[in-house]
Amino acid sequence: MKLEIKPLTPGLAEDFFDFFDNRAFADNSPMQPCFCCRPQMTKEQEEVELFGLIKENPGVMPRDIPSFKSTLRKIAEQQILAGYLQGYLAYEDGVSIGWCNANDKENYSTLGIGEEIRNVYKDSPNERIKSVLCFEIAPNYRGKGVATALLIQVCEDAKIKGFDAIEGYPQLRAQRETFLHRSGSAVRKSRVH
């Protein structure tokens, strides 16, 4: 398999949405719908735009609320254009097959789940940390090294851009979760050499 890894830019937004709309959750994953935009949302935006829809539809899974996916997509579009949503797309034969949300940790300090992340591991005040929050790989490509290739690119770019360390937050769970359900996390931190 010949992979190409590209950083997300507004020019690649169509590939990003094509991946999440058509391949990311082809296995009917309970994680859908998702456009990986929640970590970049403010708590207020999350409360009004997402939890408001959930509260209006008690007992209904978010993926079954008709306007939930379109709301997430609109938020992701805005975040991509503004540069808040950052990460990498993996391609095979010009088709997007994987995604990794990776950003400067400081960008999460006042956004979305940022405070939770910052409280997991206290940094030295002068360190630049690249945070890796999420991977999503098309079902037919899982277990074939796509996430590894994405992570290698994150690490290479972090080194070039002068980051001091890379942090990840692997989920400790036996199975995939539904949207908004939380489980324990562990932190892995690696120095950039």
Kindly give the residue locations of the regions a language model identified:
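Short, solvent-exposed beta-strand-terminating loops
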Residues: 21-37, 100-111, 157-158
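Conserved GNAT acetyl-CoA-binding A-motif
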Residues: 129-132, 158-178
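A short helix-loop-beta-strand connector motif used in the catalytic cores of GNAT acetyltransferases and
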Residues: 47-53, 57-88, 106-111, 131
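Conserved acyl-donor/pantetheine-binding loop and adjacent beta-alpha core of acyl/acetyltransferases
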Residues: 75-82, 91, 95-134, 180
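Conserved N-terminal entry element of GNAT/NAT acetyltransferase domains
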Residues: 1-58
